[in-house]
Amino acid sequence: GSEMCIRDREQAEVLEDKYKGGGGGKKKFCISTQHYSFAVNAFVDLIKKYGQDEYDFSIRETQTYEIIEDVAKMNSELGIIFMDDFNDVVLNKILKSNDLEFHQLYSARPHVFISRRHPLAGKQIITNEQLEAYPYLSYEQGEHNSFYFSEEIFSTYERKKNIRVRDRATLFNLLIGLNGYTVCSGIIDKKLNGKDIIAVPLADEKDMRIGYITHRKGMISRLGNTYIEALKKYLQ
């Protein structure tokens, strides 16, 4: 069926690259990702390297379940997600049932993203108790709004003020406008996120494992491998 056609096409692309020296027609590539600036930066690097006269590339910043679905249906070659001790058992079961694999790239200590003008901005480390008075911002996950699909680490600490958003720009505007905060990997890009956002280590939370998912029946293309290498550069 469609999977066999995709595998045949992937193999044909590999052979074409091998015997034509990477020439040929319009290059196509798609990835799906949680809301990470480093995923965008790596995508920029990929286009700068392979963006010839013709190409058709896609990057989807979307919900966790949709990332899994995109790779399972082979609409995306790679999916960028994170796992931790809380969600890995459930997510690995879902990945296995969809013939997907998770490949870890980086282990990150959780950080808090806050405005540079936030009352806690001068702290070397921030605790959950100190954050209690401020709005907690997270990415909503639509129909699959389970803790296991969250883009932020699960915390046993109850958050009294919660705001859910769909996109990164809205989240950062609310961080600044409301003195809100979100929990993330701590990898920050001033060009994409702005100079007004800073990352401060969060106390008492376990590490996040950032990586990519692939389809067991698929083959990582040359573009895919180049993108993975670009990711590693930003995650160092």
PLM features: residue spans?
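Secondary-structure junction motif
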Residues: A39-A42, D88, N128-Y157, S221-R222
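Central regulatory/effector-binding core of bacterial HTH transcription factors
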Residues: K26-V90
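A late-sequence structural motif
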Residues: I198-Q236
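Short beta-strand->loop
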Residues: K96-S107, G186-I187, G194-R209
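Hydrophobic hinge/microswitch elements
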Residues: A72-E77, F82, Q141-I198
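Short helix-loop hinge/linker segments at domain boundaries
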Residues: R9-S32, K48-Q52, L95-E101
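Short, small-residue-biased leader/transition segments that mark boundaries at the very start
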Residues: G1-I6
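Flexible hinge/capping segments at coil-to-helix
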Residues: G23, I94-Y136
